[in-house]
Amino acid sequence: MTTLVPASLFLLLWTLPGKVLLSVALAKEDVKSGLKGSQPMSPSDFLDKLMGRTSGYDARIRPNFKGPPVNVTCNIFINSFGSVTETTMDYRVNVFLRQQWNDPRLAYREYPDDSLDLDPSMLDSIWKPDLFFANEKGANFHEVTTDNKLLRIFKNGNVLYSIRLTLILSCPMDLKNFPMDIQTCTMQLESFGYTMNDLMFEWLEDAPAVQVAEGLTLPQFILRDEKDLGYCTKHYNTGKFTCIEVKFHLERQMGYYLIQMYIPSLLIVILSWVSFWINMDAAPARVGLGITTVLTMTTQSSGSRASLPKVSYVKAIDIWMAVCLLFVFAALLEYAAVNFVSRQHKEFMRLRRRQRRQRMEEDIIRESRFYFRGYGLGHCLQARDGGPMEGSSIYSPQPPTPLLKEGETMRKLYVDRAKRIDTISRAVFPFTFLVFNIFYWVVYKVLRSEDIHQAL
């Protein structure tokens, strides 16, 4: 009995260190495994699991495939509103285009962050809407210093895609009131391949869908605050496609056209009236002034049309230029009338001399029938009282009337008439032009402007 107790005690003491070491080793392994389980997944591993080859995500298939259409919410931030060109009827704009939609396949829980900002190169790995600008003439992306694109994925599967674009968009213009017009330019966002059964565009409702950079100014226009948002669904042979649009209202500023067109043409018309105060005998001065103003006005009118498209209707600037040209041409014709009237006395006196000469010839022929002195019969003629009639008394023409005095009177009469034309023109031309100006500006700046504002 005594020999068995020491043996068992010896066995216990021999195996105890091994058990302690084994317990410590197992405890270390448990601690390591616990720490490894609580450590978050690396971003690379997470992205590979979310949209990599092993994730089963296919960027060629839209979300909710064979289910309800994908709703894409759009909003635009305008960085700059470039030149509006009348000849080509387009405008240039630089924008941030933002699209947001939900892709349930990209929802996650494994990563602690609420959203992930991804590199633009990841755009090729996910599905994107096939948005294009229906009225686009030209566009380009921006790649300085890197691709101006943003991709953000949220925890619930929402995707935010933002891109910076410079666009040249078509803008059909109505130039009847040019340069006192208000143009409405549209921007249409449309799906290229997905019909409305697969994709729907809509404007952002929680915040302004179209924002403009603070302090944005245009050289010739004022961009009005009212921006009409709407839908422009397109129907083609291939189906019905979603489309949304925004309308920008651009009110033209007249400062440039007042300085370059209206005021110069106004001064040319006033300059043509100077000829009314120049002596009518100074024909070179008056004719030269008239022709110069006509040619200058013609050049001015041609210059105003050079920067505008060739349209079939009459514009406000065309009416102004045509009337100004008519006034300067009328001033030139006025001198032609004055010169013609002032020379009428010469024609009158020439006619009077011709008539007098004809009467004298008729009198000579009539009286010569009774003049027979050359035939020796003069002593046979008797007067009414019975006495003989001398041959010299048979024809005694009356003394000629003083034509010189009559000519001077007629010359003064017609010259006074010509001067009266100049005097009347000095009042009629400015008054008529003033009436035209009142009518012109009231119609285009008041009446038509109110009609345009009501239509908007």
From Swiss-Prot:
SUPFAM superfamilies xref list: Neurotransmitter-gated ion-channel transmembrane pore, Nicotinic receptor ligand binding domain-like
Glycosylation sites per record: N71
Disulfide pairings: C171-C185, C232-C243
Stretch forming the signal peptide: 1-27
Tissue and organ distribution: Detected in the retina inner plexiform layer, especially at the border between layer three and four (at protein level).
Stated role: Glycine receptors are ligand-gated chloride channels. Channel opening is triggered by extracellular glycine. Channel opening is also triggered by taurine and beta-alanine. Plays a role in the down-regulation of neuronal excitability. Contributes to the generation of inhibitory postsynaptic currents.
Note in the entry: The alpha subunit binds strychnine.
Activity control: Inhibited by strychnine.
InterPro entries, per database record: GABAA/Glycine_rcpt (IPR006028), Glycine_rcpt_A (IPR008127), Neur_chan_lig-bd (IPR006202), Neur_chan_lig-bd_sf (IPR036734), Neur_channel (IPR006201), Neuro-gated_channel_TM_sf (IPR036719), Neuro_actylchol_rec (IPR038050), Neurotrans-gated_channel_TM (IPR006029)
Site entry (Important for obstruction of the ion pore in the closed conformation), positions: L295
UniProt membrane topology term: Multi-pass membrane protein
Ranges in the topological domain labelled Extracellular: 28-256, 305-315, 445-456
Chain sites annotated for binding strychnine: Y236, N237, T238, G239, K240, F241
Cytoplasmic side: 279-283, 337-423
Protein location: Postsynaptic cell membrane; Synapse; Perikaryon; Cell projection, Dendrite
Name listed for the protein in its UniProt record: Glycine receptor subunit alpha-4
GO molecular function list: extracellularly glycine-gated chloride channel activity; glycine binding; transmembrane signaling receptor activity; transmitter-gated monoatomic ion channel activity
Gene it is expressed from: Glra4
CDD domains: LGIC_ECD_GlyR_alpha (cd19009), LGIC_TM_GlyR_alpha (cd19060)
Quaternary data: Homopentamer (in vitro). Heteropentamer composed of GLRA4 and GLRB.
Lineage: superkingdom: Eukaryota
Biological process, per Gene Ontology: chloride transmembrane transport; response to amino acid
A Pfam family: Neur_chan_memb
Gene3D superfamilies xrefs: Neurotransmitter-gated ion-channel ligand-binding domain (2.70.170.10), Neurotransmitter-gated ion-channel transmembrane domain (1.20.58.390)
Similarity comment: Belongs to the ligand-gated ion channel (TC 1.A.9) family. Glycine receptor (TC 1.A.9.3) subfamily. GLRA4 sub-subfamily.
Catalytic activity: chloride(in) = chloride(out)
